[in-house]
């Protein structure tokens, strides 16, 4: 996959200025990819957003209940997706333990988390400055 190279971001309006005086109520951002694609995202402490949607040449791909522990539903241009019920955290912890025991890399290394933190920091910097921010490698 590709990592984003730059981001712009905007803080949404605050409908409860007391509750959200020290934190954003909502935030939208646009990640620029090296090939020119733009990824638009939104997060909110107020709105109930629990879905993921991607628009591509061959149609729309989406997940509902995307961030729950179970109950995800997905649709593609070819029909519904079928998800087995799994405990994601248990599978990841078991894989970490096996990777250490078997002296092999894990598919989700710490570098991915560090990359994600850099992207999140760039999103907040873009929101605070109102400017396009390059994402450090």
Per-range role (PLM):
Residues 1-38, 43-49, 111:
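Rossmann-like dinucleotide-binding domain that binds NAD(P)(H)
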Residues 3, 92-95, 100:
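Hydrophobic alpha-helical segments typical of transmembrane helices
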Residues 32-34, 55, 72:
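A generic structural motif
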Residues 34, 98-137:
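C-terminal helix-rich "cap/oligomerization" subdomain common to oxidoreductases
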Residues 36-38, 49, 60, 78-80, ...:
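Short, mixed charged/polar active-site loops
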Residues 46-48, 60-61, 69-70:
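Short, surface-exposed beta-strand-loop junctions and turns on beta-sheet-rich folds
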Residues 52, 67-77:
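Short polybasic amphipathic segments
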Residues 82-94:
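Active-site loop of classical SDR/Rossmann-like NAD(P)-dependent oxidoreductases
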């Amino acid at each position: 996959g590709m990592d984003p190279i730059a981001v712009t971001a905007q803080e949404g309006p605050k409908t409860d200025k007391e509750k959200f005086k020290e934190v954003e109520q909502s935030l939208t951002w646009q990640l620029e990819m090296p090939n020119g694609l733009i990824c638009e995202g939104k997060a909110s402490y107020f709105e109930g957003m629990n879905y993921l949607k991607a628009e591509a040449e061959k149609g729309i791909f989406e997940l509902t209940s995307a961030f729950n522990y179970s109950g995800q539903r997905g649709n593609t241009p070819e029909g519904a997706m079928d998800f087995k019920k799994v405990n994601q955290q248990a599978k990841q912890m078991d894989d970490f333990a096996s990777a250490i025991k078997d002296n092999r890399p894990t598919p989700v290394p710490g570098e991915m988390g560090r990359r994600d933190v850099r992207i999140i920091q760039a999103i907040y910097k873009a929101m605070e400055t109102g400017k396009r921010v390059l994402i450090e490698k």
